[in-house]
Amino acid sequence: MKRTFSGLLAAAALVSLSSPVHAAGTYAATQYPIVLAHGLMGWDTAAGIDYWYGITGDLKSNGAKVYTTKVSAVNSSEVRGEQLVQQIQTILAVTGAKKVNLIGHSQGNQSVRYAAAVIPNQVASATSVSGTTGGSPVADIIAGVAPGGSFTNVVLNAVIGGLGQLIDLFSGSPGLPANGNAVLTSLTTSGAANFNRNFPQGVPTTRCAQGAAVVNGVRYYSWSGTGLITSGLDISDYPLAGTALAFKGQPNDGLVGQCDSHLGVVIRSDYALNHLDTINHFFGVTGRVDPVALYRQHANRLKNAGL
């Protein structure tokens, strides 16, 4: 069954979950469990819709033990990172595993990096998918039109916070703290730069380069795309093509720039995928690149690395 952790759950409740399903294949059978961390406005399962659409099931069918986590849909990367750390501790306690392989999408990049920095002895790898290592100029623009203390900022904070709480409610995690201003600050280029100073592990020291492959025993990886209109049938393509204008012609996926997504070993950062394609949304309608296969291949990469 799907293993979902909404906030820090009691270990006794987790133990009551059914035993892991024995998978038919072993291609993705990593030594350590794979733990998925969602991005901004994210969820695990909400109203029957998986954030990691088709990804968890494919990994399991190829032998992986996969856990999806649920942190605040809207909050600072530090708050979300600490929530993730607590859930990792629970997963380790229940499974008996010594470490986990973390994969974070979008703002989940900062969540997994926080966890890897705080508990490196319990993290085998940290992988960023379409991650906000360098922040986003889209967040810069929003912050610019709604400066702190302004009426616009008050309204925007209320709207973003309210949406986050609604997502948390529908995903079965009501009561998680929400802070629109905090998340906006985290995702601006200046906010990301500050986060990088505090958590530099795996961050490239030269723009557009790769970062350190291993820091404190944790392996760092990343991949992302530069696609926009990747499928005419995917309605999310069109707003992402609009937000892409914020990048002034630089390669991007609609929300994150190509170079700003780099972390550790860059597997590839120019897939024909946009920001939502990399989690196989909306509902598996993507272009010529299969995003599900990328996760399967990465699990095999981790397996072959002894992770």
What is each stretch, according to the model?
Residues 38, 82-192, 253:
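Serine-dependent carboxylesterase/thioesterase catalytic core
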Residues 19-23:
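Sec/Tat signal peptide C-region and signal peptidase I cleavage site
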Residues 37-40, 69-74, 105-106, 128-132, ...:
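Active-site-proximal beta-strand/loop segments in catalytic clefts of secreted hydrolases
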Residues 1-8:
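Bacterial N-terminal signal peptides that target proteins for export
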Residues 205-307:
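C-terminal catalytic-base region of ester-bond hydrolases, centering on the histidine
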Residues 173-231:
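Serine-hydrolase catalytic core
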Residues 25-100, 148-156:
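Active-site catalytic motif of lipid deacylating hydrolases and related acyltransferases
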Residues 9-16:
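Bacterial N-terminal signal peptides
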